[in-house]
């Protein structure tokens, strides 16, 4: 382990000597040196013991200042460092923490918090939590053990338990001792119990809540369960009356007379309050009838033989292929009969059609064919609206028409087409006689 150099521990003027090898430290410097060495070794090798009670909220803060002195180079007395530090916590010998213990740390520049409600099953059993601190700037690590000795609590569990949902708090804010103390004080003024304990604190995100938007300083919300030894007060019972239940179903705030005692610091959602009376709960535990511990005789065990009997799969193979093939063949024959043998044919259709209808349709088809042939052979000018920028026959570029030089109101529609150069002329119809295409 790297220790501070001796001339950095005190004032150089405090050293005296009569020559080389005869230097002495003053009493003040000696005390500072021993205190520094003791603090370094005690922080690295010491374990902390805590004694929470079963069924009572346990909170342990992992202070960054406590671990800063464990990362080399060790700071001098009075030196301030603000390195980012994160923590990893797990049960000794296991990759994670016990089920009742939670951990939260918002940023590497804030303290971590271990919190939870110890269970009665772990009473008398020391729970060793390994805490590993990581310095994100120097990549140094430091390890510390937290020994949790769970003690049995009196009157565990408390018979009357109430769970409140506080909308304007995050879980790490609620875990602060002064904030939690203020909330318990407000509950005590409303409930008036002789014994009041915080049982558990749960973030709303762990109950399926949504992450709030980063606007208007919105909070996640936190559930706080408290227990007392006296029945619920009339103020807490007001949530159960029909009027308030109806308002909650309509997403309206219920009318609670004691809400003003919390409103100064805590915004409570009274529609989500839960009141549990342990004295009225029916126990579903059934007494276990212990027997002799001997299983009933099921006869002699006969394991299967080593040599398995061979099985012929030829019949199964034929059935698997023959049945689908036969069905497919029948369907094919039915389809072939319908397509080939049940067709009318053109001759049968013409025989059943009257002659005048056949002549009418044949004339229409003949006229249609003649029109198509004529449309292929005719040579007429294209309309101006479809003229390209070049001539469709010669490929020469046609100059654009400037309509400003002409009086478009008096100009015939076909005059422009007749005056265009290289324009194909429309054949004129003869005035005398008949003309056939």
From Swiss-Prot:
Ubiquitous. The keyword Transmembrane helix applies. Changing residue 60 to R: In DYT11; affects protein stability; the mutant undergoes endoplasmic reticulum-associated degradation. Coiled coil: none annotated. Pfam families: Sarcoglycan_2 (PF05510), Sarcoglycan_2_C (PF20989). Glycans are attached at residue 200. PANTHER family: ALPHA-/EPSILON-SARCOGLYCAN FAMILY MEMBER, EPSILON-SARCOGLYCAN. This is Epsilon-sarcoglycan. One of its GO terms (biological process) is cell-matrix adhesion. Residues 339-437 are cytoplasmic. It is found in: Cell membrane, Sarcolemma; Cytoplasm, Cytoskeleton; Cell projection, Dendrite; Golgi apparatus. Changing residue 92 to T: In DYT11; results in gain-of-glycosylation; the mutant is targeted to the plasma membrane at reduced levels compared to wild-type. It comes from the Eukaryota. Belongs to the sarcoglycan alpha/epsilon family. It is linked to Dystonia 11, myoclonic: A myoclonic dystonia. Dystonia is defined by the presence of sustained involuntary muscle contractions, often leading to abnormal postures. DYT11 is characterized by involuntary lightning jerks and dystonic movements and postures alleviated by alcohol. Inheritance is autosomal dominant. The age of onset, pattern of body involvement, presence of myoclonus and response to alcohol are all variable. The keyword Glycoprotein applies. Residues 1-317 are extracellular. The gene is SGCE. Keywords: Cell membrane, Cell projection, Cytoplasm, Cytoskeleton, Disease variant, Dystonia, Glycoprotein, Golgi apparatus, Membrane, Transmembrane, Transmembrane helix, Ubl conjugation. It is a single-pass membrane protein. Changing residue 184 to P: In DYT11; affects protein stability; the mutant undergoes endoplasmic reticulum-associated degradation. GO terms for cellular component: cytoskeleton; dendrite membrane; dystrophin-associated glycoprotein complex; endoplasmic reticulum membrane; Golgi apparatus; Golgi membrane; plasma membrane; sarcoglycan complex.
